[in-house]
Amino acid sequence: MISAVLTTQPVHIIGAGLAGSEAAWQVARAGIRVVLHEMRPDRMTQAHKTDGLAELVCSNSFRSDDAANNAVGLLHAEMRKLGSLVMRAADANQVPAGGALAVDRDGFSAAVTKALAEHPLIEIRREEIGGLPPEDWGNVIIATGPLTSAPLAEAIRALTDESALAFFDAIAPIVHRDSIDMSVAWFQSRYDKAGPGGSGADYLNCPMTREQYDGFVDALIEGEKVDFKDWERDTPYFDGCLPIEVMAERGRETLRHGPMKPVGLTNPHNPLVKSYAIVQLRQDNKLGTLFNMVGFQTKLNYGAQQRVFRTIPGLENAEFARLGGLHRNTFLNSPKLLDPQLRLRAAPRLRFAGQMTGCEGYVESAGIGLVAGLCAAADAIGQTLAAPPPTTALGALLGHITGGHIETIDAGPRSFQPMNINFGLFPPLATAPTHGPDGKKLRGPEKSVAKKQALSARALADLDRWIGDCLKLPAAA
């Protein structure tokens, strides 16, 4: 499908976050001109701090890079096979993070910005699109993300006659490494697991006793919160990005079974005593001078954050490079509004990508941007691209967005919700593995591992066939 055909009409892409940047790259790789519109720095958002493309506003983690055993790791592998700019920039700017792929956020954004700015077929325009695109833009990708500007959001709502749902997305605090007390904290990845660029000792761990944990939970619940704006009230949270104080309010033990779970970690300062809970910090930049507090997104006000988080053992004198925050996110009822090519049924010249479609996570957003870019490139030369097989991570995610969910439950509100990639979105195996390589019958966890590995192997094989048959390109190694 992809060929170096220069068309007179460019593809217009609105929004240069992860999805828009990846879409622009894929369209340009196909030989199609791109005009990439980004409103920053002329108009900033509540969460962005720079004018860089593909700025990471929350975590710096792309999560697991294990393609054989983890669905997001599989998505990484599929995107690499398709020449993803986001994955190339992530690989080039990785920082140690155990079994995860984490990046230096500034280096990552700079790499994406440089690649797009230097591409001869990509024009970057720093301007806000204050409403629906002009009618003479016949091939448009809207990838404006969770913080779509109000005029454009209202225009989309008016066009679709749908009230976009909204949820909160959260930012975790970042701590200066040299302010952490290493006589209390220690380096270790959970179960000593090493990952890309890592050593198996990539997280900083701060232990808590039962008494310290109980006091911390009380302080979280009692801490002063930032008041919601009128337009934020009654907005549901997305469970994958709950504020830590909301988790604490759901039950006293919630945190120690979530981001503060102590399993797989041993305190070398006191190896015979098991910690009741552990706070982990993950390296945030290549220099190793900044560490972010894993899972500590919050709506506490700045004063409460500093007071409460400095009760954590090892962080008594913590200096914060950035405190946490919370912002609203919006998404479409995509199964109803979008066709399998991610086009708006009410206006097929408009295609959507990224978090607005109902995918959740950096890599998922970029992955849907990748698919949108390939589809738009096909449209530009009068072709239609077959969707990636549903057995692949990209295809499974696309299926979730464009038709994998029930519209209503008992005539109530729609049930479509944002989703991270997971093996539950994949079609079942025709024959699930029952025996291991040694011929022994698989049981319990071994059976689950074998199933995930079989799903991943099937996905990569099917993606290679799709690349060869539909894109007419050799699959990357």
UniProtKB/Swiss-Prot annotation:
It is found in: Cytoplasm. It catalyses: uridine(54) in tRNA + (6R)-5,10-methylene-5,6,7,8-tetrahydrofolate + NADH + H(+) = 5-methyluridine(54) in tRNA + (6S)-5,6,7,8-tetrahydrofolate + NAD(+); uridine(54) in tRNA + (6R)-5,10-methylene-5,6,7,8-tetrahydrofolate + NADPH + H(+) = 5-methyluridine(54) in tRNA + (6S)-5,6,7,8-tetrahydrofolate + NADP(+). Gene3D superfamilies: FAD/NAD(P)-binding domain. Its cofactor is FAD. Keywords: Cytoplasm, FAD, Flavoprotein, Methyltransferase, NAD, NADP, Transferase, tRNA processing. One of its GO terms (cellular component) is cytosol. It is an enzyme of class 2 (transferase). Its main location: cytoplasm. GO terms for molecular function: flavin adenine dinucleotide binding; tRNA (uracil(54)-C5)-methyltransferase activity, 5,10-methylenetetrahydrofolate-dependent. FAD binds at G15, A16, G17, L18, A19, G20. One of its GO terms (biological process) is tRNA wobble uridine modification. The keyword Lipoprotein does not apply. Belongs to the MnmG family. TrmFO subfamily. Catalyzes the folate-dependent formation of 5-methyl-uridine at position 54 (M-5-U54) in all tRNAs. This is Methylenetetrahydrofolate--tRNA-(uracil-5-)-methyltransferase TrmFO. It comes from Rhodopseudomonas palustris (strain BisB5).
